Amino acid sequence: MSKGIITLFLLSNFALAQVDIELPELGDRVSGAISEAEVELLSEQFLQQVYSQAALIVDPIIQEYSELLLYRLSETSLVNDRNFTVLLIDDPSLNAFAAPGGIVGINGGLFLNADNESQFASVLCHELAHL
């Protein structure tokens, strides 16, 4: 009796493993989850909040380096809209973020803690994946 139950259990699990399950497209803005107008509005609101609450690093050399690296990395990404806004946040913590509308924030701590450009770029690639 127990061999029959075990066999039935194994066969049912095998049958379930063969079921074709449709997974949703993750991160696909064109699927209609959010309109381009809503993305633009969210982006504007987010930027206003950052500008009012966060201290920014104002350094043209670091800004240009970060933007050029981000654009270079985006050439091999799936990001269609490459109109990025790069924010350099004056915060020593090791962090970065992405927000709707192509906003990428980079904390100063990322510059301080990355041992080389590859480590820095890997974080930017991660943020690009959110866009």
Model region roles, listed by residue range:
Residues 12-14:
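N-terminal signal peptide c-region/cleavage motif recognized by signal peptidases
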Residues 1-8:
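Sec-dependent signal peptide recognition
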Residues 18-131:
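Peri-catalytic and regulatory segments of divalent metal-dependent proteins
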Residues 8-10, 36:
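Exposed boundary/loop context
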